[in-house]
Amino acid sequence: MTKIAFLLNGTPVNVDDVAPTQTVLDYLRDFEKLCGTKEGCNEGDCGACTVMVTDPTGQVRALNACLLFMPQIDGCAVRSVEGIAHPDGTPHPVQSAMISHHGSQCGFCTPGFVVSMAVAHAQGAQDHDQILAGNLCRCTGYAPIIRAAVAAQSAPVPPHMHADHGLLAQLHTEKAVEAAEDQRYYHP
């Protein structure tokens, strides 16, 4: 089994019994009971499982949790949709914009859109068609979602969204070859 350390929604997590091929999606849903991250296609096509990942260099990316293995987040900060709002419950600007612009209908895809938009918001990115190209919606249509992204882009980035990179230095991680029952993973 593999031992890893990471931040989850701003909280340090140490896991010493995760299989090297365990996906972040399954870990979030099955072990942490964070079910906002959805399993849509389980192939990286729909974006319903998008999570925010900050690596030790401070690079922030929106990644598909269904394609991300747990050892790949060793030493990183992960934010699921549950960790996008301020810890006091105040919605993130993209969450407020999605509500006010009616960017959700059935809601299944909404968490992935919100996380992708929050990553773009943190980076100051404004090419929303490109940013959201990895997220699919079958009911709302994309116009209200794009309007929400545009509306949120001028809002200040909430302070808790910048805190993860500073907290990563406190994690103790080891890069190693791990093996478990014919499963191997090397974290480069």
PLM features: what roles do these ranges have?
Residues 1-188:
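Signature of N-terminal electron-transfer/Fe-S-associated modules in redox systems
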